């Protein structure tokens, strides 16, 4: 099954638990989502499907992916763990593909503590899933499928249900916070942001800054850490992980390039404006220093 390496490991773990071998695709350097044309080149008679990811909450290139899947009679599954609140052409992200899997874990903008949601195109798949999540049976205790205990507890379900009411206001607030970051760093030419196509609404589970050079990322990370600001280098490419290196059969230059330069910065509901401004100032100052150091080093090498 074709899947991006630039994702959280659980995307690929799920394929392996179902006996599917991952074939790693590269991602688009602007959106960080799966590169449709790269995926096209990986299709063989053994390919059964594509697992695409809505990276950081940005919808993947859905229409071309659905067209590609139809052309080759492939299943299309979306890892929508970051996708609650995101929209593609005015539709919620659960409306696409054969299935979409959303996370409600504690790091998401809507949470049930743990657990998630699954949407299906085919009602028969949805019905089968109700068996699979509860040992494979219903009230009669007659197993029709080999299931597992994947039920959400009543407490977690209640928390998630109540949290859904917060989705729209929380997402609107996050968009305001992101805009404040972008405005504060608009004069920093060594930084770029994840591109958001005009027909998409970003879910902003995470906010990633792309630095021109790895040294600038390292400098910003160190400066922020010194002030007690948590950041993360996200994602660590799956094809580089110990357990998945045997499936790394080709170079993924964009994935590796992003891995060396992206840094996720603070984004949460009660993040004060003053802290956004302070984080932005630290990033700007550290990036400028790193650029000056790299320029000087280049001059010395050429002298």
Model feature map: region roles:
Residues 2-80:
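PLP-dependent aminotransferase-like
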Residues 102-103, 116-122, 161:
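Short beta-strand-to-turn element immediately C-terminal to the catalytic PLP-Schiff-base lysine
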Residues 8, 32, 57-58, 109-112, ...:
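Nucleotide-sugar-dependent glycosyltransferase donor-binding/catalytic pocket residues
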Residues 2, 23, 76-77, 101, ...:
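Structural detector of well-ordered beta-strand residues that form the stable sheet scaffold
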Residues 6, 20, 27, 54, ...:
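Histidine-centered beta-alpha loop that forms part of the nucleotide-sugar donor binding/catalytic region
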Residues 14, 41, 91-93, 101, ...:
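Short secondary-structure boundary/capping segments
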Residues 37, 49-53, 62-64, 87, ...:
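PLP-dependent aminotransferase class I/II
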């Amino acid at each position: 099954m074709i899947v991006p390496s630039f994702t959280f490991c659980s995307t690929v773990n799920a394929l392996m638990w179902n006996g599917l071998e991952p074939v790693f695709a590269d991602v688009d350097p602007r959106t960080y989502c799966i590169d449709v044309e790269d995926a096209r080149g990986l299709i063989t008679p053994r390919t059964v499907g594509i697992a695409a990811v809505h990276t950081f909450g940005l919808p993947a290139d859905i229409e071309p992916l659905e067209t590609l899947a139809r052309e080759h009679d492939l299943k299309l599954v979306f890892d929508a763990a970051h996708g609650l609140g995101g929209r593609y052409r005015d539709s919620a992200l659960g409306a696409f593909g054969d299935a979409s899997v959303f996370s409600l874990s504690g790091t998401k903008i809507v949470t049930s503590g743990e657990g998630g949601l699954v949407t299906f195109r085919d009602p028969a798949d949805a019905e089968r899933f109700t068996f699979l999540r509860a040992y494979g049976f219903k009230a009669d205790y007659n197993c029709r499928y080999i299931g597992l205990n994947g039920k959400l507890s009543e407490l977690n379900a209640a928390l998630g249900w109540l949290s859904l009411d917060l989705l729209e206001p929380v997402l609107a607030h996050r968009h305001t916070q992101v805009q404040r970051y972008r405005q504060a760093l608009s004069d920093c030419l060594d930084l770029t942001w994840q591109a958001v196509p005009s027909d998409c609404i970003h879910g902003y589970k995470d906010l990633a800054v792309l630095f021109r050079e790895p040294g600038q990322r390292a400098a910003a990370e160190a400066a922020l850490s010194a002030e007690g600001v948590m950041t993360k280098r996200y994602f660590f490419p799956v094809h580089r992980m110990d357990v998945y290196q045997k499936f790394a059969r080709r170079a993924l230059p964009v994935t590796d390039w992003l891995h060396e330069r992206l840094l996720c910065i603070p984004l949460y509901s009660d993040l004060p404006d003053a802290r956004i401004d302070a984080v932005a100032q630290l990033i700007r100052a550290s990036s400028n220093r790193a650029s000056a150091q790299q320029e000087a080093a280049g001059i010395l090498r050429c002298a």
